[in-house]
Amino acid sequence: MARQNKHSLFPNIYNDSLTQNIEGLDQDNNRISAKIIKEGALTIFLNKQEIVTLMCILDHPIYLAIGYLLNQNMIGKKDKIRSIDFDKDLNLIVVRTNKKTNYEKILKKKVITSGCAQGTVFGNIYEEIGKIKITSKIIIRHEWIYEISKKINQIPSLYLEAGAVHGCVIINKNKPIIYMEDVGRHNAVDKISGYMFLNNINPGNKIFYTTGRLTSEMIIKTVKMKIPILISRSGFTSWGVEIAKKTNLTLIGRAKGKRYTILSGHKRLKY
């Protein structure tokens, strides 16, 4: 099992179902055994309607499915979920709510994002996101940014074992508490979103860290979760920065060692 207690979850590097060993050669023509990530297809149904099939790591299918539906506005935080059923043999998950659902129109209106494996945003999410304003007065101390990166790099992870994955982490002050990985960064953030929703975690006093780029997709998902501070070791896109400024999200990128760049929400940073 992954290391877990109340509101704490980290990667399980001992789960053999997530990796496999493949024989190969190194640069000197020596035979080696390489550990690689297992990627699978997860099909998500909402009530009786098939929504999407995601290529992903199948470690937390329920969190991924719920987070995906939340971030696509297909379920709301006030909706009552009647049941969640996962068929491990078919890699199929069915989420049932009390609402009647018909997403024919919303599924036709989609934007292919810059996310790994072609993330998709449905409906009017881009139009709606500008109406959200993050009002949290949480602060992040200058020294925490370096401490957060250092602590995350020391946590045993699938990335350190095999590479080929992105990571997303929820931070409480300067302490990592929830760490999700996946082959696509949008999947990793959806897992975070689903976990926080199902465990009723307050986002207003948390910090979000991602290994991925700070694109519009990543900013939108962070804002939808109402998390006030987003950090990445990677860089920014112009649309991502624009959305962060409109929604009052603190946006910190290129956080490597003791260096970083902040392009939005400067008031939450304390030196």
What are these regions (language model features)?
Residues 185-271:
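Feature captures the catalytic cores and cofactor-binding loops of soluble hydro-lyases/lyases
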